[in-house]
UniProtKB/Swiss-Prot annotation:
One Pfam family per UniProt: PseudoU_synth_1
GO terms of biological process kind: tRNA pseudouridine synthesis
Family per record: Belongs to the tRNA pseudouridine synthase TruA family.
Gene Ontology MF terms in the entry: RNA binding; tRNA pseudouridine(38-40) synthase activity
Catalysis: reaction(s): uridine(38/39/40) in tRNA = pseudouridine(38/39/40) in tRNA
Official protein name in the record: tRNA pseudouridine synthase A
Assembly: Homodimer.
Keyword tags: Isomerase, tRNA processing
Source organism superkingdom: Bacteria
Amino acid sequence: MRTIRLDIEYDGTDFAGWQRQSGTIPTVQGTIEKLLSQITQEEVLLNGAGRTDKGVHARQQVASCALHSSMELSRLAHSLNCLLPPTIRICNAVHVTDDFHARFSATERTYRYFVSETPSALCNRFTGCANALLDVGVMQQMAAMVVGEHDFTAFSREERDSPAKRCKVTSCRWHRLHGMVVLQISANRFLRSMVRYLVHAMLQGGKGRLAPTLFQDMVESGTSSYRMVAAPASGLFLWRIGY
């Protein structure tokens, strides 16, 4: 038995998220597990570093699993890529120590969110659209308020009585890149849909519809009387996993 690490990228548009689901609902984890089991002739269960939601993409998702198969890993990755749909790629497959766990060994997760200010037929699978010119200076001011350890319940789909509400954000900043407005945010962990709720709130600030002071109150208190909405999944990428 050996422990394997897979580095994976995917276009999440046509998948119901990372995590396997019952029945025939297509998920990234379920698709890879099925093919891995087919190739190795053994039941394979993957552990992912991040549980991306329906429609969310990954530049670097990391998964780990235990395998009895002694197949050369370069051959295993090649076989997987030959069978996987073109929207999922195995970028790397390596042997790791038995105590490695893709989720629990991770110390930092980084997401990027890409925003176009005007609609684009070519980019709509991979961006959210603001339909407005944005004040990135205001959005950057709001992003700085997120850094640190906070209760992010107001920016998530977690139940209010969930015991694990606090996340430590190590960096959060907006910048312009190739005609897009891009958020990059890193933290030790994220609540469900947390990045998308934060993005929507900061976009509202960039449009002059949400005062930064109110946003700061929401971050510091963990509560909100403001109607929270999640930004579209299409613009969000799991960008990097740190170990």
